[in-house]
Amino acid sequence: MKIKVINPNTTLAMTKGIEHAAKSAARSDTQIVAVSPKMGPASIESYYDEYLSIPGVIEEIKKGEEEGVDAFVIACWGDPGLHAAREVTDKPVVGIAESSVYLASMLAARFSVVTVLPRIKTMLEDLVDSYGMQKRVLNIRTTPMGVLDFERDPEAGIEMLRQEGKRAVEEDNAEAILLGCAGMAEFADSLEKELGVPVIDGVVAGVKFAETIVDLGKKTSKLKTYKYPEKKEYVGALENFGRNQTTTK
Amino acid sequence: MKIKVINPNTTLAMTKGIEHAAKSAARSDTQIVAVSPKMGPASIESYYDEYLSIPGVIEEIKKGEEEGVDAFVIACWGDPGLHAAREVTDKPVVGIAESSVYLASMLAARFSVVTVLPRIKTMLEDLVDSYGMQKRVLNIRTTPMGVLDFERDPEAGIEMLRQEGKRAVEEDNAEAILLGCAGMAEFADSLEKELGVPVIDGVVAGVKFAETIVDLGKKTSKLKTYKYPEKKEYVGALENFGRNQTTTK
Amino acid sequence: MKIKVINPNTTLAMTKGIEHAAKSAARSDTQIVAVSPKMGPASIESYYDEYLSIPGVIEEIKKGEEEGVDAFVIACWGDPGLHAAREVTDKPVVGIAESSVYLASMLAARFSVVTVLPRIKTMLEDLVDSYGMQKRVLNIRTTPMGVLDFERDPEAGIEMLRQEGKRAVEEDNAEAILLGCAGMAEFADSLEKELGVPVIDGVVAGVKFAETIVDLGKKTSKLKTYKYPEKKEYVGALENFGRNQTTTK
Amino acid sequence: MKIKVINPNTTLAMTKGIEHAAKSAARSDTQIVAVSPKMGPASIESYYDEYLSIPGVIEEIKKGEEEGVDAFVIACWGDPGLHAAREVTDKPVVGIAESSVYLASMLAARFSVVTVLPRIKTMLEDLVDSYGMQKRVLNIRTTPMGVLDFERDPEAGIEMLRQEGKRAVEEDNAEAILLGCAGMAEFADSLEKELGVPVIDGVVAGVKFAETIVDLGKKTSKLKTYKYPEKKEYVGALENFGRNQTTTK
Amino acid sequence: MKIKVINPNTTLAMTKGIEHAAKSAARSDTQIVAVSPKMGPASIESYYDEYLSIPGVIEEIKKGEEEGVDAFVIACWGDPGLHAAREVTDKPVVGIAESSVYLASMLAARFSVVTVLPRIKTMLEDLVDSYGMQKRVLNIRTTPMGVLDFERDPEAGIEMLRQEGKRAVEEDNAEAILLGCAGMAEFADSLEKELGVPVIDGVVAGVKFAETIVDLGKKTSKLKTYKYPEKKEYVGALENFGRNQTTTK
Amino acid sequence: MKIKVINPNTTLAMTKGIEHAAKSAARSDTQIVAVSPKMGPASIESYYDEYLSIPGVIEEIKKGEEEGVDAFVIACWGDPGLHAAREVTDKPVVGIAESSVYLASMLAARFSVVTVLPRIKTMLEDLVDSYGMQKRVLNIRTTPMGVLDFERDPEAGIEMLRQEGKRAVEEDNAEAILLGCAGMAEFADSLEKELGVPVIDGVVAGVKFAETIVDLGKKTSKLKTYKYPEKKEYVGALENFGRNQTTTK
């Protein structure tokens, strides 16, 4: 099967890392295609970045339909555009935050998230609440490092995660740690060994969940919420989004 | 004061209607500027449309900074891009859904929303929950009519709203009716008379709340969640969003 | 328009302060009438005081009907008698706690309240929950000072608010501060400057929301919950409450 | 022991009925004193009536302190003034709504309330939510009959309860029925036989819970929320409430 | 009346202590029968122990039917098997955790639980949530001592409870303390004196609630959730559970 | 890998069906071992049956440790003993209800469950709530058929599911249907075709999730809630549960 992993930001070095993580988790007969959108931000660290990454994500989903993709993974821990992505295709689409919390809840009774800048705490709190996980998530721990700081200085990154992960275990009593950014996959194994609790990277979780749903032959429900978008005109820089739509009408 | 009312869709006839409603509610010394974005969908009836309307909305917010705008109203009942808009400016930004539910809760103990197509019910449920109104909102009633159907055939529109409004009062015991689309302002008064309960149009509510916040001299908190976006590169059709940013760095 | 601001306690010096705050926020064509009830407690710092302030509040609402009042503001951060007030008049009635949390949620993603004695914490927690704001309110911070202590010793008062406000910002990560007592209006501006986040006084918020609702021509829904009280006999010291009622029968 | 049962309304015929129910449930060595306040409404059917009944209720609690009362029952299904009552005495105070829902939840997984006029539905919904029973209470069923209609025409009353009780069992799948008014005790037994599920009258539940708490030697916590009210001046018709207070200072 | 108090663990010394507490609280005309099951764990400190205690508890409930028991108390602070117990008998069954939280909520606005090992915190959190008490319970405080450590070394036990109880009052602002284990009854009185807030032992609370429900002549609803189990075959070590069932068929 | 699928009831014909479904979903290199416990009920249709199935389930988990099992699936839609199972092994254990709701929430915005007898509705409601799915699950639809009726008369079974599934789609607007019993796998495909929405059988979902977690090399967190049970004596018919324990001490 073919799974398209979309890194919603446009930093290709990070996409490479995500691709690596995805391939290491995928089955040998699963083809991983990892991409960044053709438009959007270099990293996602605010509502602004998140919303502006979505057009590019949707475009990649739409292209995926023609590319014979069987399932999609949105590889950013805000799950940007997830619900819209489910509208434009009937192939399964999973987010890495979503996959992380569901996976974690099958391994641990309570857990914490460790992520990037403090400003995204509210965004992630509301996200995990939307997945019904408010009681299970003990804390969203942020760091002073941005998304690309983890790319640029992985040593500082792992040190920061180690520190916050330890505090999550000791102060929150977190029974698992969720890495709240798609660029942290490489740190998961060593952290897990050090911390002694499951450390969950969303990219690998998302890829495996995508494989699972394809194996089960399931597709997104097209009954109501996730029907194909209504056909209509789009103008300006986003004009193409109104064209060649697979739509309900 | 100058209030910019942004109709997130690109249907100018609808923007005209919104402008008319906004002006009729604004104080004589309030200048209303009603616009549609330069890019995006002709109407918003799905997550797809909603997310794709946001870049255009943000662009209008940013332009507003240079235009000397004192406050912004996002005039679509999904409040698209509201949190991002609060990041790019320190001027108050209010959504019409948000304004509607807060206003309604000061007039009625329980209420229902009447809106467009069934597919957006989930979206609106999650939205009113995010405002803490899950207990007060009895029902989100949808109609078979799309956003622009109400523009094209106002007579059918009012008839549909009358019918669902009546059922909201009789079956839900709704003590107020919220019109769940920016293009329904013109119907509010006659519906209110017929139904005997407050009928709330979000555009006028949003404009008045915006005036109030400006009068109070309040600005959006820039401490954490709504800080200016981090400065970074944007590529492709959205390249401009990385340029000339008012940012934290 | 004429807005009656009811300070539910009987301390006229405090009513003067509230009147001053209300007038400073009101439009020039808005007439502010600030009163204390003819019966009740000198301050409200318990359920006991709160409930016993309500008969006096209701009396003032009823009188307001004859005085040509267009809207009412209940100026105590427990919103005492708010729902009953909405029964005895069809003019809009807003509470200052209610107004504060709705206003704050349009300016900040998360916030804390700073108020008087520790014993009222439970009362205020339950109140903000009833407005659906449990997720947004990070903390109700109390001080060892009572309501009238803030009147008697404003210097100690501002110092106390400064201290708790600072802890709210630093420890709670509050993005706005709500002053949880009607007698704190005078401190709002200097606190806002010092703390660097919106500081919200409920009296001015309430007055502006009242103006807004009158401007919109909206009245309280009389369909069900807020119908006029059933006509019936009242005895004893409250005998008058059964007389000359505007009632449903 | 001596239990004072306070019917918060001033209709003595109803107080008699409540006294009868209380005595029939009390142990032989429990002395029941049933009273109505000296001031307030003839019945409670709105927020207005509810709040205006509270001063009279509090007065009776305070008198009870001198009368050697061991525990108090507030015998109206809105539990008016319950939290204030717990402030003015350290003797246990229980409400009949509170007692009913806790008792019911030890007998049935899900249940419905049958009560008087439609207008009080919101009030009772918010009340049962405040006791954490939102998931257990399936429905608050109202009837077109007021409180005193049940006194005046018990035959119509029982018929109405039978009808709504039956619908609660058949349509809501209620596994117990709670009689949502203090004047319905006399109907409980025959309804229980007919409906085949527990039918709970709050007055007898409240009296037995009060006995239990006295037996256990427990008193209301005076640490924080329920401390004695702060000593202060009261004016006007409620002047006495500031006098001879048992207070914290 | 005859109340059977079931200590779900098989440590008879602890059952003796529970019997003592139960008898000290029961009325003189109440016969207390305290037992341990014939099978199961020596103490309950995990989901494992809890579930494995349930067959023994159910067996004791069933025997109670023949022994002329009027009501049952399940004396472990996890309320093991409570819902199943309500299926196999129509006599009232109360759990001591359930009784504790309902009793506490009639005495205090907010409270904390002090219990045994850290590992059961999740279990107790989910339990109090299931009783709707998430807002009232401020904290579940655990200790490094197991259930039988409190039996073996009561002096260390009381010291531990004193310490955590004090922190509950000072740090959580708990207005009552709930002893989260059936073997702590003996410590309740002295702790209450020291801490100055109600200290609630579940065994005595459960016994008194059981007496109350018997006095009221109420039985468990057999309409739906708590119907007698369906008759069916059981095999292996639990074979007897399929025999001589009082069942619906 | 080796996955042990435990049908918690002792009806081997049903275990065969579950094995068939599991094998059809498993990868070719996954070995499925499907068993029924050596003790317990022939079917699970009450709290009684559910709790009494748990000792047998736990025994099978423990045996699995010696059998070289890599992961466990508990194949009953009440997920009996799930938390205890996670204590006795560090291999992943998933429940089929849990798997179903997480899978469904990646395919559909809102869904309903169709299951056996009405009496288990409360049990399943509380279960899906414990997974945070209260907002997504629109309805738990029951049928007059018991678990084994579906085995005995599959034609009546499919007809019943078809009927309730249709009502779920039409009346609840369910966008997916969850089959709320392990014995319904065989009906899933034809129902999905007829109803036009995803129809989810928990057994196949559980098996695939188990494979995924094994692939990811993840194990249950042993930090706190799911630590191995404390070592202790067990007596009577369950005596073996105290022996040869893998425990924390």
Swiss-Prot record, chains A, B, C, D, E, F:
Top EC category: isomerase
EC number: 5.1.99.5
Activity regulation (record text): Strongly inhibited by Cu(2+) and Zn(2+). Slightly stimulated by the addition of Mn(2+) or Co(2+), but also by metal-chelating agents such as EDTA or EGTA, indicating that the enzyme is not a metalloenzyme.
Matching InterPro entries: Asp/Glu/hydantoin_racemase, Hydantoin_racemase-like, Iso_Racemase_Enz_sf
pH-linked activity: Optimum pH is 9.5.
GO molecular function ontology, one term from the record: amino-acid racemase activity
Site positions per UniProt: Seems to be responsible for recognition and proton retrieval of D-isomers: 76
Site (Seems to be responsible for L-isomers recognition and racemization): 181
Temperature dependence: Optimum temperature is 45 degrees Celsius.
Gene3D superfamilies, sorted: 3.40.50.12500
Pfam families on file: Asp_Glu_race (PF01177)
Catalytic activity: a D-5-monosubstituted hydantoin = a L-5-monosubstituted hydantoin; D-5-[2-(methylsulfanyl)ethyl]hydantoin = L-5-[2-(methysulfanyl)ethyl]hydantoin; D-5-benzylhydantoin = L-5-benzylhydantoin; D-5-isopropylhydantoin = L-5-isopropylhydantoin
Any Gene Ontology biological process: amino acid biosynthetic process
Key words, A-Z: Amino-acid biosynthesis, Isomerase, Plasmid
Function summary: Involved in the asymmetric conversion of racemic 5-substituted hydantoins to the corresponding L-amino acids. Catalyzes the racemization via enolization of D- and L-5-monosubstituted hydantoins. Is able to racemize 5-substituted hydantoins having aromatic or aliphatic substituents such as 5-(2-methylthioethyl)hydantoin, 5-isopropylhydantoin, 5-isobutylhydantoin and 5-benzylhydantoin.
Similarity comment: family membership: Belongs to the HyuE racemase family.
Subunit structure: Homohexamer.
Protein name: Hydantoin racemase
Organism whose genome encodes this protein: Pseudomonas sp. (strain NS671)
